[in-house]
Amino acid sequence: MARKYEIMYIIRPNIEEDEKKAVVERFDGILTENGAEIIESKEWGKRRLAYEINDYRDGFYHIVKLNADKADSINEFDRLAKISDDIVRHMVIKEEA
């Protein structure tokens, strides 16, 4: 049975527009390649952070809603987001059925 997840991640603010699109496409691709079905992937815009992260005071928020049967896609996203220089913070939420 597919579970619903929501992923929110913050992209560094000093990124070029085309690079930002490439980051979003790359991470959406990671999810779909590992068996997830993306329901919605939307940009939330540039927002001020509640506190400074890696010397950044703001960042580009992006939200992805998806269905996944197994946690493989979520685990791979989590692993790669942790080592990516473009993503300063991310959070995965499993939605209630």
Curated annotation (Swiss-Prot):
Disulfide topology: none
Pfam families documented for this protein: Ribosomal_S6 (PF01250)
The keyword Ribonucleoprotein belongs to this UniProt entry's keyword annotation: yes
PROSITE patterns in the record: RIBOSOMAL_S6
InterPro entries: Ribosomal_bS6, Ribosomal_bS6_CS, Ribosomal_bS6_sf, Ribosomal_S6_plastid/chlpt, Transl_elong_EF1B/ribsomal_bS6
UniProt record, GO biological process: translation
Keyword entries, A-Z: Ribonucleoprotein, Ribosomal protein, RNA-binding, rRNA-binding
Record GO cellular component, one term: ribonucleoprotein complex
Gene3D superfamilies documented for this protein: 3.30.70.60
A GO molecular-function descriptor: small ribosomal subunit rRNA binding
NCBIfam families: S6
Family (UniProt): Belongs to the bacterial ribosomal protein bS6 family.
Annotated function: Binds together with bS18 to 16S ribosomal RNA.
The name this protein goes by in its record: Small ribosomal subunit protein bS6
Organism: Listeria welshimeri serovar 6b (strain ATCC 35897 / DSM 20650 / CCUG 15529 / CIP 8149 / NCTC 11857 / SLCC 5334 / V8)
